[in-house]
Amino acid sequence: MAHGGEMNTSIPCYGIIPARYDSSRFPGKPLADIWGRPMFWHVYAHAKRASVLRNIVLATDDERIAEAALEWEIPCVMTRRDHASGTDRVFEAASKLGVEPHAVIVNIQGDEPALDPAVIEQLVRPFLDGTVQVSTLATPISPERAASPNQVKVVTAANGDALYFSRSRIPFDREGGDGEILGHIGLYAFRMGVTRRYGFPFHFSTRIEFNSNSIPLISTVFHPVKANMES
């Protein structure tokens, strides 16, 4: 992975780590022990190394996670239990923290204990353009990995704009050849003010509208993907 230099920006950026206890596949995952510390501690420690983040907090709906965060001296915000997604939980936490409308919120996945802080800095860089409201990431993947429905792929236009995301194999090549396929990386950043247009909590139709925007793609090892929500 490529590592860029430290990014200097006056944009206020906050990292929020959603941590839900009641996962159907792995209940209590944020508390999973990794080398004597809970998983969320490792996520937080790696995120702290990203120089662009002014503050980082955990957002949870469970007292067990909140108590563990207190024990490890990690800031924590309690949220509702009925959120449909981690993104909704992140925005509730940001609202409770009184984050500025022009500030950038990075939704840091709570199950990425080895997260490279350079990836966060790449994700935030597009917001130096004041029109950018949403950013995410993609990276080239092998045809074998692309064949898995567990890997979300990114469809791009001829000019490199990301058009939509799909679990199906894309792009479809009628000649049977394989072009570069981009796999989506589930890390997002938003301007806080985006909630004023799309409302809170985000509903399924809103997420579809997010994904249907034409999103300029910047070519790096990890591709920051940015969207002008007015487009």
Regions found by a protein language model. Name each.
Residues 9-59:
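N-terminal glycine-rich phosphate-binding loop and ensuing alpha1 helix
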Residues 53, 99-102, 131-133:
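Short, high-confidence coil segments that cap the C-terminus of an alpha-helix
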Residues 200-204, 210, 222:
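Aromatic (phenylalanine/tyrosine) cluster motif
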Residues 205, 212-214, 219, 228-231:
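Low-acidity, Ser/Thr- and Arg-rich intrinsically disordered low-complexity segments
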Residues 1-6:
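Short, Lys/Arg-enriched N-terminal segments with co-localized hydrophobic residues
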Residues 115-202:
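Conserved core of the sugar-phosphate nucleotidyltransferase
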Residues 57, 64-108, 112-125:
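Short phosphate-binding loop-to-helix
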